[in-house]
């Protein structure tokens, strides 16, 4: 791993821990660090197959899915308390930081994962604001669905809704 890569991971994780206000800066830094030419903006399969995963990614996505699944009925009924949305956002941020810090994906799979990470971070930021909390949760649920559809993680349990 290069010094630049280690420094990027340290900065990214620290930034996540300090504030979600830096989501756009984090996303721009992530895109700059992993720029492999043309930016990918929509999910794609790997020549018709799902992308490979690593253990940290599987673990982090499972924890995010479990946290959302525990509250999905209240999210759908629009009865989830704001403090629960904030707690969910915190768990998402923790797990995203973990998957970034421990990422060992090949570059093409990593580029696809960045689309999901962007949606997770955007959703978690929205969940911290009462006026957009439910929409943020829906964005996270959609990101989890994309993970299930595009990454080969046989242990992953998508959100039941």
Label the predicted regions:
Residues 56-59, 63, 87, 91-94, ...:
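Charged, amphipathic alpha-helical oligomerization/scaffolding segments
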Residues 102, 113-161:
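Helix-rich interaction surfaces within compact, conserved domain-sized segments
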Residues 95-113:
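Short, solvent-exposed, charged loop/turn and helix-capping segments
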Residues 68-75, 82-85, 89-96:
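Amphipathic, heptad-repeat alpha-helical segments
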Residues 2-14:
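Bacterial N-terminal signal peptides that target proteins for export
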Residues 22-24:
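N-terminal signal peptide c-region/cleavage motif recognized by signal peptidases
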Residues 45-57, 77-84, 105, 112, ...:
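Non-transmembrane, amphipathic alpha-helical segments
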Residues 29-80, 159:
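Immediate post-signal-peptide N-terminus of mature secreted/exported proteins
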């Amino acid at each position: 791993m290069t010094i630049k890569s280690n420094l990027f991971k340290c900065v990214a994780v620290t930034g996540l821990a300090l504030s979600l206000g830096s989501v756009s800066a984090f996303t721009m830094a992530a895109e700059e660090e992993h720029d492999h030419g043309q930016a990918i903006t929509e999910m794609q399969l790997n020549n018709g197959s799902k992308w490979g995963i690593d253990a940290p990614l599987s673990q982090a996505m499972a924890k995010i899915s479990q946290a959302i699944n525990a509250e999905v009925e209240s999210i759908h009924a629009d009865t989830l308390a704001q403090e629960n949305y904030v707690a969910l956002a915190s768990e998402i941020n923790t797990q995203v930081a973990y998957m970034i810090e421990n990422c060992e994906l090949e570059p093409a799979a990593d580029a696809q994962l960045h689309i999901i990470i962007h949606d997770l971070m955007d959703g978690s930021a929205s969940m911290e604001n009462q006026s957009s909390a439910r929409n943020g949760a829906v964005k996270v649920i959609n990101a989890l669905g994309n993970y299930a559809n595009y990454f080969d993680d046989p242990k992953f349990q998508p959100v039941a809704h």
